[in-house]
Amino acid sequence: MAAMAFELLVLLVCIIAYAICRRRYLDSPVCAVPLMTAITWVLERAYARAPQSPRLGAVIICILICWRCAGSLALHVCTSMRTRGPSVIACLGCVLSPCIVACSLALPVAMGAKWHGAALFCANALHACGLWFSLSIAAFDRYARTHRCNPKDCVDVIIVPGAALRGSRPSPFLASRLERALELWREQGCCTHIVVSGGQGSDECVSEASAMHRYLAEQGVPDGLIIDESHSTTTKENMRYSRQLIEEHLGAGMRVAVVSTDYHLPRCAMFAASEGLDAVSVGASSAHRAWSRGYIRETVALTRAILPTYGIPILIALVCMP
């Protein structure tokens, strides 16, 4: 009875946190991931106390969720290592895949063996981490796939967040965003303003905004339609400073399209909503080999971004877990 009351309390707090997050970040998938993790975790714990058949079904479902994520991650890591050679991110992916599999088995093993105390606590924590990571990747991937088409309605401004440069030119990674923005710009009638947003890194000879401006100008975009934002260093600052420039040059209430790499879209959508932008997301397809690197990084970044909202239920779960 105490365990059930605790699980319902965690769910209630997660639902409240979800409502707060949804109000702030609108349709960003980051809102749903913690709630879905909590629901899956609570259902599995509840089914584990049920007769054998329901218990087995719940365990299989949760294990398959995690194993699908681990398998996709391993596949993309292998592709990346074959085409680009070993890297830190690739090695991290090689470690994460078996870790996710191990985490998916932690709680079923613990409950089957009737563990108690610290052992059960660790099993719960590991299992929750595996579910969190797996559901995050699934949610971000689905969001990216559903935002690859151009918006049906007209937009007033296109925002392109910066990325790494090669010398004074956009990297292929950044060029794919710019090409996607150009495609949307032409479809909108070649009269939409484009905000290129990105400061100058310590290892860059020009700002990302300057490099993007030159690239777009070479592709036929008039200088008068390109607005440079060259002070931001993070995605949050991209959205904040871009909003300020849009209001300064064009006024408030502009309809905005944020164009970025597909796996970067959830974080862009989250911060655009938090800045009050009326924005739609448009994704540029990432290279197959960059999939694992991008989703690992985005999962970590988004987890860090929402910790202030979901810190309370996480703390309750860790401290009070029966």
Where are the model-predicted features located?
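Membrane-anchoring/interfacial helices and their immediately flanking loops
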Residues: 1-82
